[in-house]
Amino acid sequence: MTDNGDTRMAGQDQAPSAQPGSGPAALAKTCNKFDAPMPTDLANALSHENDDSYSEERTAKRPRMDHPAGSNDVSNGQKASENNSNSQHADENGNENGEAPPAGTNGTVDRRAGLAPIKKEYIIEVSTNRNSKSDNVDDDAAEGRGGNAGDARDSREDRDGGPRGKKGKKEKRRKGQNTERSFGNSRDAIQLCNSRALYSEFSPHECKYGDKCRMSHDVRKYLEEGRRGDVEAFGGKCPVFEQYGTCFSGWKCRFVRSHMKEVEHEDGRKELVLIDKSNEKKFAGEDGTKGVKVSGGDGTDERRPGIYNNVDMSIKIELNRKRVDFTKADEYIKWMNDEANINNEFHQRRKDQSTESIDDIRARYVDPPFKPSEKRRLYFGPETPALAPLTTQGNLPFRRLCVELGCELTYSEMAMSMPLLQGTKADWTLLRAHESEVSPPAFKPSKTNFVYDDYDHSRDIRFGAQISGNQPWIVTKAADALNRFCPNLRLIDLNCGCPIDMVFKSGGGSALLEAQGKLERMIRGMNAMSGEIPITAKIRTGVKSSRPTAPSVIGKLAFGSREHRERLGAPGCAAITLHGRSREQRYTKRADWSYIGECAALIKAYNEQKDALTDTAAEPDPSTLPNSKDGRIYFLGNGDCYSHIEYQEHVEKARVDTVMIGRGALIKPWLFEEIGKAQYLDKSATERLTYIEKFVRYGLDVWGSDEVGVGLTRRFLLEWLSFAHRYIPIGLLEYLPPSLNDRPPAYVGRNELETLMASGNYKDWIKITEMYLGPVHPGFEFQPKHRSNAYEAEG
């Protein structure tokens, strides 16, 4: 198939390709198409297209994925693909190369469990020694932050690194992992003061630090000596300026030559000025006013257009200094603590205690100081595939790309509750959302698929926040803060499944699965203080594989403990998401969708028995009910969804309301598009490159086009490429559906660009970023989750 930028659907005829590669000329043409300069080292590399040793080095470093061997893998894959009757055989049956592979056809194919079934003509032979360097992939990088507490931060100052600590004995066993990652720094040689960054050279604007300021105030000197040259990608034009008519990075922009000029005054002086076209009609608002404004003059990224849930720095300072009034939350927390103490006293009573003393204990129970507000109604259904909360990977530019490709529900990266209460900028920044995420999901309510009369689609949005905490009082106050300072939230999700040691050992994440009384109090407290924002929870099957606890956890979340059920009603959990693995399993086993189906049946039974399990003497208070019709709970499944076939099977067979997708979206974000169209889409390498270009544009939009913003965009693009390179084009597969956990052998793509994008070699990832962001900064470092792919600046 020629790489002409067209999407190939399953069963669609494609042009034959005699050779897997199409030569360096095709890649050069691709770079020119997107105004991306051809990096020197990439040009040199492509000149070796006939050099077998180079091809082996670039394509052999494919990651191994943890996957249990067994005959089940083949039969399940074949059975799931029998429904795809439109697929055609593209090899032995005489069809052209590059066509969609057959569905479930095995024939004489040498199928090895855990190995992707790539067609023989694309597989290359590599030495055993070279293969041995490829280690197993640790996909926990996408689920929770690792040993670096400063990692996974969507802020410019705080995301570049974190505190380093000593390794414990258990950490030493995980020798292949970068548990304490550092990303170097991307700074200008001369730091230009923010008081000058957005103003013309002769502007009278004064620096608030006066003579004590350590930064430069000389714009000309900064441009000549203090910064690297302009990036040549995008034709040298600033993507932010092209979008808004002004650039929020000012003189610090790596594309500043495209929006600056020198003017000569009457007295002969020449002044450097920034161009501002935001008043022009195409950039103006609907009312004719100026479309965008640069806030404050301090170069901050807190007020970028199209970004919501921006929390003012003054509020963060007040939180840090403990000046925010949490009187109402404190009142509810005191009641919860008293309630817990009475419960402990009641359950620990002596057998010889008299009935009178037991009655005295019961008499001390009091009602909550106030009732929760009625919640905004939610809807989860087959039309609303959801993107899972992904630490580091689920940043705003990536979520924006997924929404553009058909994702209907998104979640923030996991924010820690205590840092939120301390006003930590990094955690509050995680809650920012793009304007596409705060619009209603793109489905139309109808009588056939929509029966909830009190659901207001116009008030619904796509974006929800996920938080983690280990104490009821912490998450209760965090929910209060989110309700007050982040108005654009669909829901607040409590993480009860994070397997990372740092979270688990502190009593949060999956540790809550074995502290169900505390978990119930956390949900009640959050529900009481979240205003109209619904509360949801994400759980795992359990901590230990041998001791699944999901059914009992679901019971507590749905109806509360027996001693509270009649008096207080349900805790108020609107939806539950179950990840079909235990904490112990991590990603070493497939997600257990049969178990998810059993829990879904349990939820259905609970919903049917709701009236019998709640107080029959009086109608339940609407504020105590979960956020759906008649107080019924939504149930989402999560784990290993990698095709529209699997998505449909999970909805129909496991009977979940919808599926939450994590790694599958990281590897191919257009999975949401496939789900919407109910067909496989064979994206060409050129099309996939356009998604990378969009990510870069979105990254520069949110993080800035200065040196720091370019460095952050490059880092998070590399984080994404560490997953995206594992995509195997369906035209290269023997049969469908593809398996998320299959490890691909070393192979060559249908052209040079496809081969480059399939490489597990970090040097090739760097080359891809250089197409749009220019050469890396001398101080830049990249350390992915596994050391085998680490990158450091070479000097």
Region spans (language model):
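Active-site beta->alpha loop and helix N-cap motifs at the rims of alpha/beta catalytic domains
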Residues: 313-316, 321-361, 435-529, 533-534, ...
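Glycine-rich phosphate-binding active-site loops on the catalytic face of alpha/beta enzymes
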Residues: 258-266, 413-419, 496-499, 570-582, ...
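C-terminal helical cap(s) of enzyme catalytic domains, especially alpha/beta-barrels
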Residues: 425, 432, 586-588, 595, ...
